[in-house]
Amino acid sequence: MGKLLKPSKEIGIVGYGAYVPMYRIRNEEIGRVWGVSNFPIEEKAVPGLDEDAVTIGIEAARNALKRAKIDPREIRAIWFGSESKPYAVKPSATIIAEAIGATPDLEAADFEFACKAGTEALQAAIGFVASGMAKYAMAIGADTAQGRPADHLEFTAGAGGAAFIVGEKSSETLAYFEGSYSYVTDTPDFWRRQHEHYPRHGNRFTGEPAYFHHVITAAKTLMDELGLTPADFDYAVFHQPNVKFPLTAAKILGIPKEKVLPGLLTGKIGNTYSGATMVGISAVLDIAKPGDRILWVSFGSGAGSDAFSIVVQDAIEEKRDLAPKVEDYVKRRKVIDYALYAKARRKYIL
């Protein structure tokens, strides 16, 4: 048996949608407060006082439904991936399902795997639909990531998310999955223990042993199993904790940065964790042409990567304009100072 994950039925994306909060804080403003002058990105998205990972997931799910043009009650599973769920004990997926009118006849659960929780949910959704147990399933990745004040994560931890509705490949699917591959090991590069507010990171594990080892291995294995080369892909979206890592991964794989930049959004909205590659793929689908092939590789600390190859179909031309595009959310911005940012992120202890 090969390593490729390929269901017996061809599965495609029926609808997709993204959402990014309006507020932004520039890295130079964070640096002004903490006396730092070297910045990994330009600015990051900040959730409003009435926003969290669930509200982001709801907005993304609604946009996906607009493009899918289906009755939400036809969705038989909603799986929500996040590491910043508002409840420690209570599923967020049920809130989203209720909000979009999908209840009560469906599966609903929350997934966790650091920044690849959303693509982990997507793998499950693909298998669930391919098994014949559901006509449609929805996978969501959304986060309002936190970084300890003055920690380097504070400069990049952003907010945003995306949702994908999958179904059997047809003339109504806007892209289909050629295959996927998942690769995981026990690598302690990043964690947050119970009752701790901010995550910790093992610096010596962060780069080569964690991100690059898993992303490169997953991408190469997927291409080898499908008999494809980097030249066969028109776009590539990698997990983007910063701007440097995905561009370096692309260079190692022999993929020109021009194929990566359209889906590389961290510099403008920060690292959206579970939403990172899903928002990036949404941005690429907003501009892709029928026949384009896209390499999609997520990464989650702890550690693992999911790699997908998707091919864009004709329906993209009709569906992409049915909901706001990622660029619309990127341009919809209001810059705030550190005081308002700290208030919005509840960093003040009263």
Curated annotation (Swiss-Prot):
Main EC class the enzyme belongs to: transferase
Q: Does the keyword Zinc apply?
A: no
Q: Where does CoA bind?
A: R204, K244
Q: Name one Pfam family in it.
A: ACP_syn_III_C
**Which CDD domains does the record cross-reference, listed alphabetically?**
init_cond_enzymes (cd00827)
Pathway connected to this protein: Metabolic intermediate biosynthesis; (R)-mevalonate biosynthesis; (R)-mevalonate from acetyl-CoA: step 2/3
Ordered alphabetically, the record's keywords are: Acyltransferase, Isoprene biosynthesis, Transferase
Q: What is its biological role?
A: Catalyzes the condensation of acetyl-CoA with acetoacetyl-CoA to form 3-hydroxy-3-methylglutaryl-CoA (HMG-CoA). Functions in the mevalonate (MVA) pathway leading to isopentenyl diphosphate (IPP), a key precursor for the biosynthesis of isoprenoid compounds that are building blocks of archaeal membrane lipids.
Write the protein's name. Answer: Hydroxymethylglutaryl-CoA synthase
